[in-house]
């Protein structure tokens, strides 16, 4: 029976609200502020009756939403898809099965969206993403290294600080070296795999490259990390290099098999015009899947920098929303909570 003050259960809040309480929430937490209804593009859809403004300072509440539920409980079809079809701002969508892309592509295009797809299951038909092109300084390369190490750890990991620091120094040296030079085809994870594969040889090409870099800039971060790696005993260094090469083995194939050979997704432009970037098929590409946490980490850094230094008001033209289905399967994103706080500030 319908009562005069029908209670509406809001599972996200674990509370039961009356209609008056819902109206009060709408007045203070979503657009248009001060009204007891929700309307406009600048709201996230939480439920049929509850919306939440992106404007955290006005709404006095963070616009980050965590949805928990068992298989087939409606997380994708009842939460992610409606927000995507709301078509407000730009989106980055984790879509492992490709279902969201199929159901929304036509509608989004009709609304003027540019569609970009990183398809791990079909690299030949995919857009490209090269994480090295979004690295600027030593902190960026360190984050790449952390993403790579954390997301390629074997299940039988043995905690050995010396080994971990040796691999970290090697990857930091190689990534920083490639980033500093940005020589087209040579600034790729494929080239990084080649360099770590030859790093164990003393006096060979690897040493020559870094000694030449030392002449140009002795305190280059790449050179400093190289010097740390060269402190590793030769026998141990060979094992470290073999392990490092295995971590990058997924990027040692042909260009058509590797979506990191080029970059066509232009992360820095996502806030300039309405764009939907889909990350799909990664359930079929376990090794190249390491690119997803790299992309998410770099997305925050890139957009925050773009907004701060390339927009007079410090805000992007288009709000960028992450809709991350099956989030636990995405992998480890370094300092995610800090990135969320900075990205929504």
Describe the predicted segments one by one:
Residues 42-51, 56-345:
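P-loop NTPase motor domains
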Residues 10-12, 36, 211, 274:
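N-terminal cationic amphipathic segment used for targeting or macromolecule association
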Residues 20-56:
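N-terminal pre-Walker A segment at the start of P-loop NTPase domains
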């Amino acid at each position: 029976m319908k009562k005069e003050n029908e209670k509406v259960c809001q599972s996200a809040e674990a509370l039961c609200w009356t209609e008056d309480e819902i109206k009060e929430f709408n007045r203070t937490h979503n657009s248009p502020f001060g009204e007891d209804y929700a309307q406009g593009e600048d709201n996230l859809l939480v439920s049929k009756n509850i919306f939440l403004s992106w404007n955290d300072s006005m709404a006095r509440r963070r616009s980050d939403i965590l949805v928990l539920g068992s298989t087939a409980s409606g997380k994708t079809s009842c939460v992610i898809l409606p927000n995507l079809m709301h078509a407000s701002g730009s989106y980055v969508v984790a879509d492992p099965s490709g279902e969201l892309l199929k159901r929304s592509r036509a509608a989004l295009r009709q609304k003027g969206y540019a569609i970009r797809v990183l398809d791990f299951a079909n690299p030949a038909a995919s857009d490209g993403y090269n994480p090295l092109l979004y690295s600027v300084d030593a902190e960026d390369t360190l984050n790449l290294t952390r993403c790579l190490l954390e997301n390629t750890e074997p299940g039988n990991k043995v905690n050995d600080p010396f080994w971990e620091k040796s691999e970290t120094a090697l990857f930091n040296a190689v990534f920083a070296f490639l980033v500093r030079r940005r020589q087209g085809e040579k600034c790729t994870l494929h080239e990084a795999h080649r360099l770590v594969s030859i790093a164990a040889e003393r006096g060979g090409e690897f040493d020559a490259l870094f000694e030449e870099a030392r002449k140009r800039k002795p305190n280059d971060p790449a050179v400093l990390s190289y010097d740390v790696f060269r402190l590793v005993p030769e026998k141990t260094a060979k094992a470290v290099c073999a392990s490092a090469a295995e971590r990058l083995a997924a990027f040692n194939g042909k260009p058509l098999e590797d979506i990191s050979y080029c970059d066509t997704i232009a992360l820095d432009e996502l806030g300039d015009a309405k764009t939907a970037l889909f990350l799909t098929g990664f359930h079929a590409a376990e090794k190249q899947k390491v690119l997803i946490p790299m992309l998410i980490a770099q997305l925050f850094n890139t957009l925050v920098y773009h907004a701060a230094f390339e927009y007079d008001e410090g805000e992007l033209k288009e709000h960028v929303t992450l809709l991350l289905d099956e989030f636990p399967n995405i992998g480890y994103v370094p300092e995610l909570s800090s990135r969320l706080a900075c990205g929504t500030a």
